[in-house]
């Protein structure tokens, strides 16, 4: 009975009138569900182990979002925060479908600063709720995770305090979870209030983010090799900066540690099945854009093509593209089979493993998303 009431209350939260005045927003794609998930992450010195864990598990979290709603457009964002006097107070990374770009930004974050105990939690929440480009509309799923170990500075006169920010979040249809690293009592009091006012979950985890479970499978090596082949079908095009970004993504995928590489491949495989065979996130892959009908080959300027295509006659260009399309289709089909086998094996191994002594950051987030996205 209590569970039904809780779910009904949460559902009621999402259908309240949404207020957007004064806030940046994106426009929903007609007829397509949208799931937006942002993290407000403390990046002061004490959060180092958790941040490093987040870098390793961001792809499993992204996969959990896709698995909870396979038909949705997925957008993720991040607000990193420290305190006044540190290198930065907040650093905003906009909500985006380009998860590889978000991953690249996450890799650049380092845990530093935060000499006194409280941090600029109020400002960070305010930036996340009012400055990120949440999609406008009543049928959008918007979820925020506050992740930190220290309470907010309540003595900063210029800040909008968290109770008011959470009222704005409610008006905008943003559900707010509070993930507490460590066991500080003053933080717990605030984090519980944040979760209650935000209609989310209070989630306590160990200071280091908990034990991140990595299950090796017999399919991992082949998945990594196959992803390298798939990335070889990418043809960067467009302005020089865009081509450089695409090349960086394929190099970054190749350089990722094996556990990260396999989870990244799992997400990208799911994404390819949901799109026109896209194998990187974001713009700039000519093969994907031609297949999706977003681009025509004869409309691309020569100076926006890679050297391999620029020096080819028009007929040879088309033949080369067709070959890449066919190769990608075959490789993506093989990858989908391998990922399914890997997921099945990992699930069976997880069932056999002893229950962890404490929750971990990635499991806690995935568990919350599995419920909240389906409301």
PLM features per residue range, with description:
Residues 162-166, 172-176, 184-291:
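Eukaryote-biased recognition of electropositive, low-complexity segments
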Residues 8-20:
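Bacterial N-terminal signal peptides
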Residues 1-5:
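N-terminal secretory signal peptides that target proteins for export/translocation
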Residues 21-213, 217-218, 289-302, 308-310, ...:
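Divalent cation-coordinating acidic motifs and surrounding scaffolds
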Residues 304-305, 316:
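A general alpha-helix detector
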């Amino acid at each position: 009975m209590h569970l039904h009431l809780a779910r009904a209350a949460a559902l009621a939260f999402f259908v309240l009138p949404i207020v957007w005045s004064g806030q940046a927003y994106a426009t929903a794609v007609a007829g397509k569900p949208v799931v937006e998930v942002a993290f407000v992450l403390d990046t002061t010195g004490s959060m180092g182990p958790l941040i490093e864990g987040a870098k390793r598990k961001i792809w499993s979290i992204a996969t959990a979002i896709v698995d909870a709603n396979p038909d949705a457009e997925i957008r993720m964002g991040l607000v990193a925060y420290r305190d006044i006097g540190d290198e930065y107070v907040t650093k905003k990374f906009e909500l985006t479908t380009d998860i590889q770009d978000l991953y690249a930004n996450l890799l650049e974050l380092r845990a530093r600063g935060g000499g006194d105990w409280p941090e600029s939690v109020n400002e960070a929440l305010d930036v996340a709720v009012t400055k990120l480009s949440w999609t406008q509309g009543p049928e959008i799923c918007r979820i925020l995770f506050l992740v930190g170990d220290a309470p907010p500075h309540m003595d900063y006169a210029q800040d909008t305090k968290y109770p008011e920010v959470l009222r704005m979040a409610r008006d905008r249809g943003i559900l707010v979870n509070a993930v507490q690293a460590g066991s500080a009592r003053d933080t717990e009091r605030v984090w519980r209030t944040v979760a209650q006012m935000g209609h989310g979950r209070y989630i306590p985890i160990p200071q280091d983010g908990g034990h991140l479970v990595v299950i090796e499978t017999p399919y991992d090596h082949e998945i990594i090799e196959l992803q390298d082949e798939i990335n070889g079908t990418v043809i960067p095009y467009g302005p020089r900066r865009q081509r450089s970004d695409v090349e960086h993504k394929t190099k970054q995928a190749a350089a990722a540690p094996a556990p990260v590489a396999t989870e990244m491949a799992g997400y990208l495989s799911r994404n390819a099945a949901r799109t026109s065979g896209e194998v990187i996130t974001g713009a700039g892959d000519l093969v994907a854009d031609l297949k999706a009908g977003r681009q025509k080959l004869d409309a691309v300027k020569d100076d926006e093509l890679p050297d391999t295509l620029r020096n080819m006659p028009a007929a040879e260009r088309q033949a080369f593209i067709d070959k890449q399309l066919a190769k990608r289709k075959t490789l993506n089909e093989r990858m989908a089979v391998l990922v399914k086998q890997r997921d099945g094996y990992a699930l069976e191994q997880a069932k056999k493993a002893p229950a962890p002594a404490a929750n971990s950051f990635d499991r806690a987030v995935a568990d919350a998303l599995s419920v909240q996205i389906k409301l």
